[in-house]
Amino acid sequence: MLWRFLCVMQFYCLLAIYTYLGLTPHPENSVPVFNDLLMHFAGYSVAAMSISFARPTWPLWQRAAFLVVYSVAIEIGQYFNPPRTFSGMDIVANGGGVLLGLIVVILLEKTISPFAKLLYWNTQNHQNTGHNEG
């Protein structure tokens, strides 16, 4: 039970950090700027893996949809938060990151048995079949 709680909490912490960094006027004061689109891509790859641990029984399309809608919401929030701006390219990079992150989860789940057991630990699917239906 503690494992499942920690899996969910790490995702909520990630959302809180991403929301803060996405809506703060000068995030470069908190995080060094490297390549903006690469950072978006990598960040949302991590988010896709994170949501997969928090909600492993959600179908893949629901995990992807949640993160893409969240990404669009952050971009809309930036439009109203100068000097931040709305960027369609950020959304594209975020979507690509989500796709890569979910592909990595699928590959790890299918090829490394302990990963799948860890992913579904203390879920209804783990107790019944040990496999994800979505």
Question: What label would you give each PLM region?
Answer:
Residues M1-I91, G95, L99-G134:
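Bulky hydrophobic segments
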